[in-house]
Amino acid sequence: HIITSAGVVLASYYRYRHRPAALASFLAGWLIDVDHVVDYVSAHGWKLNWARFSEAKHEHYSGKLYLPLHSFELLALFFLFFKGPRRQPYRVGITLSILTHLILDQRCNPSRKPLTYFLAHRIRKRFDAAQILGVPIGEPALEST
């Protein structure tokens, strides 16, 4: 996500010449992943296990898929409410960074169904990973490193 965010930053800076907005776009494009902490804690508690955290399959342990920031609805709300000419560089750059993040996640995670990145869908399914992903969820084996 850092690479795609960097691409958006370059385009944003080229268009607006606004360094703070370019930096915000870069950070938004990959810091959205902090919401994986919610899923990790739900699955494993507060004790950090790097192998489990980095495998990013927390829904297999908890049976839940939260990812509260990975949401097309939140992106649309941001785009609709963050208006004004002074905010335009932020609005466009951040929106594009998050949108590319969500699209990349959708494409690189084939188990994720088209509605997975809609928060309303996850809420309607009560965050039940098996229903959201449409596959049985079981505890995966950790690979030894």
Predicted regions and their residues:
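N-terminal membrane-targeting hydrophobic helices
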Residues: 1-145
